[in-house]
């Protein structure tokens, strides 16, 4: 769906942003009937509260939106967006100041609150529209919202309609829209050149493939690698029913990478962008890889399979090996890789790893600037021994259960040896409960933080 601002020439209703306790000073200059109405409503400016103000003729002439205390505003994401679903249909504009709130964040949150996933049923109207607040770069915020909407659509679509073939089609549509090139590697070539991607996906009726999209002719090179496991049964180490229900989101890394690519291409920075998506389904059949198998990767490293449900790092490893061969200025991988990451930081925060402090600092600062919370975890070298089994170079599922997100990241780092700057995001990709700007369902994580970091990381 299109998430855009209302046009400037459309009639609109003013919104007055009111801090908790600030309604009296605002109302002091208003007519008696307005002050009386606000009193009767009991509106004091609490977060997300709304008061519609009638004129003397009874028609709505303004809206008051509460954003809480300074402390509440400091810890809230998309504070203004909390009011969006509560307002009547129509177009609104912000009158006056935003009480210290960041205009870009509030404008984006409003657009994201209008997102609806309507592929399988008629959905309610996206509701109240907004003109961009003063100082907001309309084109940039709309580009970011469009990328996030794409990510959400891809994750929310069930695997029956978003398998490897459909993910390839979606990637092709994106490439055509922005004049990018895209190649799909499958069949015998995939088995020969990307053996671990092939091994993970060979049991499924929808053939595994590696998608390779390129955009931009000059500038620094950025390669994004997104995990595209379109459904994950766990393989022969089959998941319990409780663990399988949300596995349509196991391609959330690919969805996030493609959504970020959309943002980048729409904003047209001077860089060379490459997006690699290993697209597979981890299914069960007589062709499934087995616990105890040893696979040889594209890089030549051998991997002992101690759990077929740790398949994401296998497909990512072959794609990362390809990315590393080109030695771009920056490689970033995004994957719904481990449950351990959720245990560590919960569902809202995207943990990431970085090979250089400057990369970590830029991503951390970028996330803070755009309300996309991230948290650095360490590439802790002493844990390398945990991913080294007795009969192969690497173990895809170390026993013991300790430091699961770190050992998975260390596994991936083994395949990035020529590129000095590498960052890996271990995302969740799902909003369990609706929040301002974040309807329940698929959600992008880390993409906006990385986009905000690119000027520091690549000078674009």
Give a label for each model feature.
Residues 1-228:
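Short amphipathic alpha-helical segment within the helicase RecA-like ATPase core
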Residues 168-460:
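A generic structural signal for tightly packed, nonpolar segments enriched in small/aliphatic residues
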């Amino acid at each position: 769906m299109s998430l855009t601002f209302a046009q400037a020439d459309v009639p609109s209703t003013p919104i007055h942003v009111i801090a908790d306790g600030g309604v009296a000073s605002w109302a002091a200059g208003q007519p008696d009937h307005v002050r009386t109405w606000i009193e009767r409503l009991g509106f004091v400016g609490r977060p997300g509260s709304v008061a519609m103000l009638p004129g003397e003729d009874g028609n709505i002439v303004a809206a008051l939106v509460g954003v809480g205390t300074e402390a509440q505003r400091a810890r809230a994401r998309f504070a203004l967006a909390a009011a969006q679903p509560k307002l009547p249909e129509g177009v609104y504009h912000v009158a006056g100041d935003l009480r210290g709130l960041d205009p870009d964040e509030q404008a984006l949150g409003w657009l994201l609150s209008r997102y609806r996933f309507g592929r399988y049923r008629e959905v309610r109207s996206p509701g109240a529209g907004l003109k961009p607040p003063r100082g907001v770069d309309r084109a940039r915020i709309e580009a970011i919202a469009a990328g996030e909407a794409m990510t959400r659509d891809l994750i929310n679509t069930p695997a029956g309609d978003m398998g490897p073939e459909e993910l390839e089609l979606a990637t092709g549509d994106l490439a055509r829209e922005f004049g990018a090139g895209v190649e799909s590697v499958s069949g015998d070539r995939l088995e020969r050149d990307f053996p671990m991607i092939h091994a993970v996906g060979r049991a499924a009726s929808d053939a595994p493939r590696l998608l390779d999209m390129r955009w931009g002719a000059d500038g620094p090179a950025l390669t994004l690698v997104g995990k595209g496991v379109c459904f994950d049964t766990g393989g022969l180490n089959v998941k319990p029913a409780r663990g399988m229900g949300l596995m349509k989101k196991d391609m959330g890394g690919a969805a996030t990478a493609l959504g970020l690519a959309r943002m980048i291409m729409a904003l047209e920075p001077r860089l060379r962008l490459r997006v690699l998506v290993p697209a597979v389904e981890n299914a069960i059949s007589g062709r499934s890889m087995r616990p105890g198998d040893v696979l040889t990767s594209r890089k030549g490293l051998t991997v002992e399979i101690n759990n077929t449900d740790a398949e994401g790092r296998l497909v990512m490893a072959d794609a990362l090996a390809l990315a590393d061969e080109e030695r771009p200025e920056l490689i970033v991988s995004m994957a719904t890789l481990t449950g351990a990451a959720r245990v560590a930081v919960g569902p809202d925060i995207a943990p990431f790893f970085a090979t250089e402090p400057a990369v970590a600092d830029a991503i951390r600062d970028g996330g803070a600037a755009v309300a996309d919370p991230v948290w650095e975890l360490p590439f802790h070298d002493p844990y390398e021994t945990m991913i080294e089994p007795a009969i192969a170079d690497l173990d895809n599922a170390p026993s013991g259960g300790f430091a699961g997100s770190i050992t998975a990241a260390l596994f991936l780092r083994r395949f990035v040896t020529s590129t000095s700057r590498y960052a890996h995001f271990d995302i969740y990709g799902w909003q369990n409960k609706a929040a301002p700007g974040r309807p329940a369902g698929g959600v992008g994580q880390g993409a906006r933080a990385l986009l905000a970091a690119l000027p520091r990381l690549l000078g674009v």
